[in-house]
Amino acid sequence: MKRFEGFQKGVNLGGWISQFAEYDIEHFNTFITEKDIAYIASLGFDHVRVPVDYNVLEDEAGNEIESGFGYLEHCRSWCGKYGLNMLIDLHECYGYSFDPLKKDMDRRKFFYDDDLQARFFRLWRKIAERFKDYPSQVAFEPLNEVVLFEVRDAWNGILAKYIKLIRSIAPESYIVVGGVFYNSVMTVAWLDVPVDSKIVYNFHCYEPGVFTHQGAYWQEQMPLDFRIGYPRSVEEYRKKHKEIYRDTDGAVFMDGVTEMGEGFFERIFEPALKKAEQDGIALYCGEYGVIDKADNDSKIRWLEDIHSAFKKFGIGRALWNYKEKDFGLVDASFESIKQRFIEVL
């Protein structure tokens, strides 16, 4: 299968210029620095995925914030110095957020609102203009985690317009596009967009969710004291998922899933792999990881299994997360297994 060259082994810089507690210049200037990029390169990574929220790049009226673009430009420069590539992910745009903690957000409106979409395209025009001269180093991801199943046709339409826009500015840059339902691997097959040699299909994988997000405070249904190991039986994960989330939407419920292990990931990746092969497109996993609350042995086993599938099919990937956000590779909670994590990565 086609590979996303230069983006095979990455890590996310979540929590830096996205998902921050408050708009704080001191935080932006210190959370990620050149030393972090140098360290990431020393670990053998080939790229970083850089989530950025719209309000770092523009004010509420849509006026450009030069210092916000400066963070991206500094990061690109550091990455160039240490031999890393960079994926710019617009984590939130004006009028849309995936964040479950933003309970008043209308997650449908953006997909049917011409004014909101026009602002989205204006911002992306500015981003593309600034980074068009680095087509082999800087890739573009239009928007993080479209939540609702029901907007899939509208999302395909927006993606088609986005690709046309970016191609008019940066014809050789990689564009990384994902499906609905939080960028699920199950919805890659629903993508229906114009393709060329620099389009990449993208998904996120936190399956089984009751394991990777056990005790997650931002999931309203999840008990804070819930714990479960890995691997367990498919039946146990399905039972716990239904008890907690009251649905059967997770990939663990896919037909043909009979056991946990590397075969589980091969099975749930299968439709996405088929779609990518059919369209001659590389496949990429932009987020995957395990919450710090899981036991260490289970974290390692899960990481080994998902990486076995990544490597078998040549799927590029970016671990969530480098620092903090309850998944941080360099955090104290991962210290005792960090070296083993790095060996698997």
What annotation goes with each model-predicted range?
Residues 22, 211-215, 321, 329-330:
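Short conserved micro-motifs at the rims of enzyme active sites and ligand-binding pockets
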Residues 27-28, 217-221, 298:
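Short, surface-exposed loop/helix-turn segments at secondary-structure junctions
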Residues 33, 268-269, 302:
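Amphipathic coiled-coil/heptad-repeat helices and related helical stalk/stem segments
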